[in-house]
From Swiss-Prot:
<dbReference type="GO" id="GO:0005576">
    <property type="term" value="C:extracellular region"/>
</dbReference>
<keyword id="KW-0732">Signal</keyword>
<keyword id="KW-0134">Cell wall</keyword>
<keyword id="KW-1015">Disulfide bond</keyword>
<feature type="disulfide bond">
    <location>
        <begin position="45"/>
        <end position="113"/>
    </location>
</feature>
<dbReference type="GO" id="GO:0005199">
    <property type="term" value="F:structural constituent of cell wall"/>
</dbReference>
<feature type="disulfide bond">
    <location>
        <begin position="53"/>
        <end position="107"/>
    </location>
</feature>
<dbReference type="InterPro" id="IPR019778">
    <property type="entry name" value="Hydrophobin_CS"/>
</dbReference>
<dbReference type="GO" id="GO:0009277">
    <property type="term" value="C:fungal-type cell wall"/>
</dbReference>
<comment type="subunit">
    <text>Self-assembles to form functional amyloid fibrils called rodlets. Self-assembly into fibrillar rodlets occurs spontaneously at hydrophobic:hydrophilic interfaces and the rodlets further associate laterally to form amphipathic monolayers.</text>
</comment>
<feature type="disulfide bond">
    <location>
        <begin position="54"/>
        <end position="88"/>
    </location>
</feature>
<comment type="similarity">
    <text>Belongs to the fungal hydrophobin family.</text>
</comment>
<comment type="function">
    <text>Aerial growth, conidiation, and dispersal of filamentous fungi in the environment rely upon a capability of their secreting small amphipathic proteins called hydrophobins (HPBs) with low sequence identity. Class I can self-assemble into an outermost layer of rodlet bundles on aerial cell surfaces, conferring cellular hydrophobicity that supports fungal growth, development and dispersal; whereas Class II form highly ordered films at water-air interfaces through intermolecular interactions but contribute nothing to the rodlet structure.</text>
</comment>
<dbReference type="Pfam" id="PF01185">
    <property type="entry name" value="Hydrophobin"/>
</dbReference>
<keyword id="KW-0843">Virulence</keyword>
<dbReference type="InterPro" id="IPR001338">
    <property type="entry name" value="Hydrophobin"/>
</dbReference>
<keyword id="KW-0964">Secreted</keyword>
Length: 139
């Protein structure tokens, strides 16, 4: 897997905005601000990656969890806010108008930056999740 988890998490952390609460009311100013932040997220996601909507959070990874030497790259990453996801589908970033309402109604879990292409898992233990997605809330 050539996807740099640390780079993706760093890029996503720079584009994070708060998720609107139940009493959230959209205004033209809020929509424009969201569109600007969403475009920053798309840019931070980078080439060879795509913005995806992931509707199933398989496991919330916490800071006490360690890879136990099985996955050395994860030993040096703060996993407190990292999630394993499945059920991810591409978000069409060309249609940014009303994207906040689209994401709020269709993305039940998180908007993520995902590596384009198949995730090949090789080894004794394989997870039934999209390991190619770095998940971080942006809405």
């Amino acid at each position: 897997m050539k996807f740099s988890i640390a780079a993706a998490v760093l890029a996503l952390a720079s584009a994070v905005v708060a998720h609107p609460g139940a009493g959230y009311v959209s205004t033209p100013e809020k929509e424009a601000n969201f569109q600007q932040n969403f475009q920053k997220f798309v840019t931070a996601c980078g080439n060879g990656n795509q913005v995806s909507c992931c509707n199933t959070e398989t496991k919330k990874v916490g800071a006490p969890l360690t890879a136990g030497g099985l996955i050395p790259i994860l030993d040096n990453i703060n996993l407190e806010d990292f999630s394993l996801l499945k059920g991810c589908s591409k978000v069409d970033v060309a249609a940014v108008i009303g994207v906040q309402d689209l994401l709020n109604s269709n993305c039940k879990t998180q908007v993520s930056c995902c590596k384009v292409g198949d995730t090949n898992q090789v080894g004794l233990v394989n997870a039934n999740v999209d390991l190619k997605c770095a998940a971080q809330n942006i809405i």
